[in-house]
């Protein structure tokens, strides 16, 4: 499932297995009926999402929807805030900075000693593929794959995938029976709601600024986090980008310097 769906989706331009190749009738391959087409789409496609989108999804007749897009299997990208291992599962709290952290549960095989049963440590950026679930009105993911990011560009790529996938799916679901895309673009309007503000951090900061702020917040030392530590932990960012983020956060009152000009603490720290 992983290789034929999730990875092929990530490495393709929304084509091939797990992709979103558009045809006049909607999804790429012909289908005997609209119901079967939708069922096949839910079963086969893994839809990239933000946590904000997942938390706002509606559940009707055991089907999750974001706007007019049906979802079942999804991917998210975020940072692990907390990890707790039980005998049969691992529960992570994953934060993509679009909403509150989301619970992600990964079931483990007690007889299997492979890396699948290894707890990924907190403060690790990961890509998660799983099934959206709701229990007592609380949404969570049941993961079938959790993979640490090797390159932070994957974070940016995921955001672009979120926009594109929901745009394509919204258009497909908005098409009339004749197969021609409507002139007035409700799909684009929906996609704007999906891919516009929803993937931006809720606090109005950029992804880079949030990464710097979260590292400073997480530092337990009384003197705070020093600039060298920021550089060591944000190797994907240039020194000038880190400095710009620090200067912005300081000017906006999110952080302050402590023992010297190179140590910073969050104003939200307890």
Curated annotation (Swiss-Prot):
Start and end residues of each stretch annotated as Interaction with RAD52, TIPIN, UNG and XPA: 187-270
PTM sites of type N-acetylmethionine: 1
Sites bearing Phosphoserine, chain numbering: 4, 8, 23, 29, 33
Cross-link (Glycyl lysine isopeptide (Lys-Gly) (interchain with G-Cter in ubiquitin)): 37-38
Alphabetized GO MF terms: damaged DNA binding; enzyme binding; G-rich strand telomeric DNA binding; protein phosphatase binding; single-stranded DNA binding; telomeric DNA binding; ubiquitin protein ligase binding
Alphabetical list of InterPro entries matching this protein: NA-bd_OB-fold (IPR012340), RFA2-like (IPR040260), Rfa2/RPA32 (IPR014646), RPA_C (IPR014892), WH-like_DNA-bd_sf (IPR036388), WH_DNA-bd_sf (IPR036390)
Secreted as UniProt keyword: no
Effect of residue 4 to A: Increased RAD51 foci formation and homologous recombination efficiency at DNA double-strand breaks
Impact after mutating residue 253 to A: Does not affect interaction with RFWD3
Keywords: Acetylation, DNA damage, DNA recombination, DNA repair, DNA replication, DNA-binding, Isopeptide bond, Nucleus, Phosphoprotein, Ubl conjugation
Outcome, altering residue 29 to A: Reduces phosphorylation by CDK1
GO cellular component annotations of the record: chromatin; chromosome, telomeric region; DNA replication factor A complex; nuclear body; nucleoplasm; nucleus; PML body
GO-annotated biological processes: base-excision repair; DNA replication; double-strand break repair via homologous recombination; mismatch repair; mitotic G1 DNA damage checkpoint signaling; nucleotide-excision repair; protein localization to chromosome; regulation of DNA damage checkpoint
Modified residue annotations for Phosphothreonine: 21
UniProt PTM comment: Differentially phosphorylated throughout the cell cycle, becoming phosphorylated at the G1-S transition and dephosphorylated in late mitosis. Mainly phosphorylated at Ser-23 and Ser-29, by cyclin A-CDK2 and cyclin B-CDK1, respectively during DNA replication and mitosis. Dephosphorylation may require the serine/threonine-protein phosphatase 4. Phosphorylation at Ser-23 and Ser-29 is a prerequisite for further phosphorylation. Becomes hyperphosphorylated on additional residues including Ser-4, Ser-8, Thr-21 and Ser-33 in response to DNA damage. DNA damage-induced 'Lys-63'-linked polyubiquitination by PRPF19 mediates ATRIP recruitment to the RPA complex at sites of DNA damage and activation of ATR. Ubiquitinated by RFWD3 at stalled replication forks in response to DNA damage: ubiquitination by RFWD3 does not lead to degradation by the proteasome and promotes removal of the RPA complex from stalled replication forks, promoting homologous recombination.
Subcellular location: Nucleus; Nucleus, PML body
Domain of life according to the entry: Eukaryota
DNA-binding region, residue intervals: 74-148
Region (Disordered): 21-41
Induction summary: Translationally up-regulated in response to DNA damage (at protein level).
Binding partners and assembly: Component of the replication protein A complex (RPA/RP-A), a heterotrimeric complex composed of RPA1, RPA2 and RPA3. Interacts with PRPF19; the PRP19-CDC5L complex is recruited to the sites of DNA repair where it ubiquitinates the replication protein A complex (RPA). Interacts with SERTAD3. Interacts with TIPIN. Interacts with TIMELESS. Interacts with PPP4R2; the interaction is direct, DNA damage-dependent and mediates the recruitment of the PP4 catalytic subunit PPP4C. Interacts (hyperphosphorylated) with RAD51.
Recorded family membership: Belongs to the replication factor A protein 2 family.
Function, in words: As part of the heterotrimeric replication protein A complex (RPA/RP-A), binds and stabilizes single-stranded DNA intermediates that form during DNA replication or upon DNA stress. It prevents their reannealing and in parallel, recruits and activates different proteins and complexes involved in DNA metabolism. Thereby, it plays an essential role both in DNA replication and the cellular response to DNA damage. In the cellular response to DNA damage, the RPA complex controls DNA repair and DNA damage checkpoint activation.
PANTHER family with a match to the protein in the record: REPLICATION PROTEIN A 32 KDA SUBUNIT (PTHR13989:SF54), REPLICATION PROTEIN A-RELATED (PTHR13989)
Identification of the protein by name: Replication protein A 32 kDa subunit
Organism: Homo sapiens
